[in-house]
Regions:
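Bacterial N-terminal signal peptides that target proteins for export
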Residues: 1-7
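A generic structural micro-environment signature
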Residues: 7-9, 61
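C-terminal motif of bacterial Sec signal peptides marking the signal peptidase cleavage site
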Residues: 15-18
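Structured, acidic catalytic/metal-binding patches in enzyme active sites
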Residues: 21-205, 216, 220-223, 251-253
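Extracytoplasmic/secreted proteins, especially bacterial periplasmic and envelope-associated proteins
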Residues: 63-66, 213, 233, 237
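A cross-kingdom marker for long, charged
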Residues: 204, 208, 219-253
């Protein structure tokens, strides 16, 4: 093969890789500037669900900030997503972190609803987003969205509770020397847990259990107007569970 052909082939391969990465960026939805809203009604009660993404443009998050501020001023109370630990010590948290990593392999849940670190890097390096001049950032803290913590409700389940419940049903997550020796911020190359258990944790705990919990809190809440800030992938499961508890809940838009 002549040098000119080799160079041409190399250019084509680079172009294809760039196209693939750019398509990946578009498919994640991180380039959308407009946030969606789902509105539910049950008599005098109103729920607005804003599906959150863990990566997005600054414009996208600015829009959510304005929506949250406006809706709170209209009397809506925020119910937000957060699986933050509720533990007594850093030692406990370290063990839970290693068990969580054993189960998910550095993932924070299902790949389609929470981006992997690898996806984040690919998105940030993608030619498409650089060309458009859009700055993709990670989801800011809720304080950025002007959430009123005096009234807001953490409508999620702590990560340690999810792990405890999983172990109660499926047995202890056994950590090996490799799990302790590998830093939490390093690539994970230890012996993985069985794929069937990973899938059960994702489906039954990361998804179903949290959706059931959110629906239960909303159904029993005294607030008449609720604004939910929760992951995009959880809306259908939340709605299904909410309507199972009370069929009078209807989706307006």
């Amino acid at each position: 093969m002549q040098l000119r052909q080799i160079i041409s082939l190399f250019v084509v391969l680079i172009f294809c890789a760039a196209c693939d990465t750019s398509l990946m960026v578009q498919s994640t939805g991180v380039l959308r500037d407009a946030s969606r809203k789902f509105e539910l009604r049950n008599g005098n009660r109103s729920v607005i669900y804003i599906p959150m993404r863990h990566l997005g443009t600054r414009v996208y998050y600015d829009q959510i900030q304005r929506a949250v501020d406006s809706l709170q001023k209209s009397g809506y109370v925020v119910f937000y997503e957060s699986i933050a630990y509720q533990v007594d010590s850093a030692v406990q948290r370290d063990v839970y972190d290693r068990k969580f990593r054993k189960l998910t392999g550095n993932r924070l849940g299902l790949q389609q609803c929470i981006e992997t670190p690898g996806d984040t890097v690919r998105v940030l390096r993608a030619p498409l987003y650089r060309k458009l001049g859009q700055r993709i950032i990670s989801q800011p803290d809720y304080s950025f969205f002007l959430v009123d913590y005096e009234t807001a409700v953490n409508a999620d389940i702590p990560k340690n509770k999810l792990l405890d419940d999983f172990e109660y049903i499926y047995g202890t997550i056994k950590l090996e020397p490799c799990d302790y020796e590998t830093p939490l911020d390093a690539p994970y190359g230890c012996k993985p847990i069985k794929a069937a258990l990973k899938n059960k944790f994702d489906k039954e705990f990361i998804m179903q259990k949290r959706e059931e919990n959110l629906a239960s809190l909303v159904a029993d809440a005294p607030q008449q107007k609720i604004l939910i800030l929760f992951g995009t992938a959880h809306f259908k499961g939340f709605l299904r569970n909410l309507q199972a508890r009370d069929p009078r809940w209807v989706k307006i838009k």
